[in-house]
Amino acid sequence: MKASDLNKSTVDELRSTEAELTKELFNLKFQLHTGRLEDTSKPARIKKDIARVKSVLRAKRG
């Protein structure tokens, strides 16, 4: 997910994307702690995507 792609999105789309990523991160953390997650770097990538979305949202708000 690139910030340039996020800049083209509306605020509502960004909020829904943030919610989806947060849910996905929760599920990945659960899988990680139960030992079912094979790609252990995925939670870190999702965290970075959430940070990108929040940065773009903050920039669009003001």
From Swiss-Prot:
The processes (GO biological process) annotated in the record are: translation
Q: Name one GO molecular function term.
A: structural constituent of ribosome
Matching Pfam families? Ribosomal_L29
Which InterPro entries does this UniProt record tie to the protein?
A: Ribosomal_uL29 (IPR001854), Ribosomal_uL29_sf (IPR036049)
The similarity annotation says:
Belongs to the universal ribosomal protein uL29 family.
From the broadest rank down, the organism's phylogenetic lineage runs: Bacteria, Pseudomonadati, Thermodesulfobacteriota, Desulfuromonadia, Geobacterales
Q: Which GO terms describe its cellular component?
A: ribonucleoprotein complex; ribosome
Q: Which domain of life is it from?
A: Bacteria
Q: Which CDD domains match?
A: Ribosomal_L29_HIP
- Protein name (Swiss-Prot/TrEMBL): Large ribosomal subunit protein uL29
Gene symbol?
A: rpmC
Keywords from the named record: Ribonucleoprotein, Ribosomal protein
